[in-house]
Amino acid sequence: MIYDFDKIIDRTNTESVKYDLRKSVFGKEDIIPMWVADMDFPTADFIREAIIERAKTDVYGYTFREDAYFESIVNWLNRHHQWETKIEWMSFTPGIVNAFNLAVMGLTNENDEIIIQPPVYHPFFYAVNNHNRKLVLNPLIDTDEGYIMNFDLLEQQAKTAKMLILSNPHNPVADSIFK
């Protein structure tokens, strides 16, 4: 497969979060939108073709995940991390933001403390604050070698916190915390 990574696609006026919300988020449009993880490359042919084939059914009803979907995750986790997981431990969510909001709502109660590690993906803040949990900040430490965790502070905070929302690889630091 050969892909053209030099092709520029104008995504303005396509309801693109990355491009069409610059003015409302930043107050101006003449910025490079590096604030959201969104691709600017054409979708791979085999993905586009699969979507087109599915769209040709002319019915867009409710769908479910085949067992093969979850089995591929179980197999990948075992192959790459030697983790023994089970399909019944998994649930599908339509995105990572939905997933960690559901985790906050399902695994903690109002006024529980939740630790996040800024600088961090801004929806982490919303997931804590919007569900009436107490935000506990464990800022990463910027060193000459890169960002590191403040484990001493984390150990103290973990005594009373009910959850740590961890971003790894870290967004926006763009580094894997555990090498």
Where do the model's predicted regions map?
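N-terminal small-domain helix-loop-helix segment of the aminotransferase-like
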Residues: I2-G95
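Short, solvent-exposed loop/turn segments at secondary-structure junctions
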Residues: A37-F41, Y121, H170-P172
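Glycine/Thr-rich phosphate-binding loops of Rossmann-like dinucleotide-binding domains
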Residues: F100, F124-F125, V173-A174
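Conserved PLP-anchoring active-site segment centered on the Schiff-base-forming lysine
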Residues: V104-V128
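Short beta->alpha connector loops at strand-helix junctions that form conserved
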Residues: P118, L137-D142
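A short helix-loop-beta submotif of the ANL/AMP-binding
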Residues: N130-V136
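Active-site phosphate-binding strand-loop segment of PLP-dependent enzymes
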Residues: I141-K179
